UniProtKB/Swiss-Prot annotation:
Signal peptide: none annotated. The lineage of its organism: Eukaryota, Fungi, Dikarya, Ascomycota, Saccharomycotina. This is Uncharacterized membrane protein YNL143C. Present with 238 molecules/cell in log phase SD medium. Residues 34-57 are annotated as: Disordered. Its main location: membrane. The chain crosses the membrane at residues 59-79, 95-115. GO terms for cellular component: membrane. It is a multi-pass membrane protein. Residues 1-58, 116-130 are cytoplasmic. Residues 80-94 are extracellular. Keywords: Membrane, Transmembrane, Transmembrane helix. It is found in: Membrane.
Amino acid sequence: MREQLKLFTREIVDFTFLILSGFDYYQTLLISSNSSKKRPKDSSLLSEKKKKKKKKKKDVLSYLSYLKDLPFVPFLFWQPGYSQREKNPRQHSLFIMTITKPGMISMADMNYVVSKNRSLNRPAERGGNR
């Protein structure tokens, strides 16, 4: 039973990594299509952005390798809210899905307001039930 759970967990982690890498590739295509508008004039700024992107990718890879050893798998799904052009802070919906046993999935839905430095501040207040 544990071996089946471990194999199932690895398949889910591999699938998640595939989705994340596809999203990263799509973002790279979008950035390269608008590169003339968004390219920083200073080369040091460009290298700093590349370093941050590499560090972020390393963090994702280390997190995914960490997930392979867990008996359960937590997943975080971010749903973007406001655009950056609006004056309101960026709002995300954070979905946490935990697989405890094969076939048993528990999910929590929390809304957070993320400020411009992208740190989690506090749960957003909801007007009513969805």
